[in-house]
Amino acid sequence: MRETDEQPVAGGAASTEGLETSIGYRFTDRRFLDEALTHRSWLNEVRSPTVPDNERLEFFGDAILGFCIGKMLLRHYPESREGALARMKSALVGEETLADLAAAVELGSYLRLGRGEERSGGRHRRSLLANALEALLAAMYLDGGMAPVERLVDAWFGPRLAGVAAGIKGRDFKTDFQELAQAQYGGLPRYVLVDTSGPAHDLRFTVAAYVGERLLGQGTGRSKKEAEQAAARQCLERLETGRCSAAP
């Protein structure tokens, strides 16, 4: 891509004060925030950029979020076993949830994007928003330590915890879907990897779920196992709400 002396899109807002108000945190060293909001497409269009892209922070933020959610789950469900905790964690930190949280604070409007990414709808792309949210959490940690991050994670995910626990705790979506598929379709599900995307340190896998030749749903996750669970969950929701016919 051709470098330019022109500034590419630098976010829809004149400043980040609105974002800081939304997350309840003011940055002391704004370089961390600038990095969290900088997509790699922006660097491709800027000559001699002074800030790196947010992919390293995204990597770090994923680990920080996992730690915070794990700590929250252990605190609220001290008797739960590892399998149930893992399923609750997976449901809480899935891409869709992170993208919803990012949209709620209008994170996309503050991102530094290249012109091509802007034109292709990157400001509203859910995978991009989820990644930027993780980068933002890492920036907060580097600037102010774990305390403000945990406060924000508790505020964001605490209200979701009871609902997730009620629907997810102890539930294996693949097993439940297999039983329902056998009952309604007379066959076993099969899972097909249809897409792998993202940088090497943060791959996203998309899996489609079939019974016979019938495509019933798909899901995305950070591992093939997580993607299969997400696909099975979507299939169950469709079957249980009548959005899929009960006969082939």
From Swiss-Prot:
SUPFAM superfamilies: dsRNA-binding domain-like (SSF54768), RNase III domain-like (SSF69065)
Pfam families: dsrm, Ribonucleas_3_3
Xref: InterPro entries: dsRBD_dom, RNase_III, RNase_III_dom, RNase_III_sf
PROSITE patterns, per the entry: DS_RBD (PS50137), RNASE_3_2 (PS50142)
Chain positions recorded as Mg(2+) binding sites: E58, N131, E134
Subunit structure: Homodimer.
Protein name (Swiss-Prot/TrEMBL): Ribonuclease 3
Gene designation per UniProt: rnc
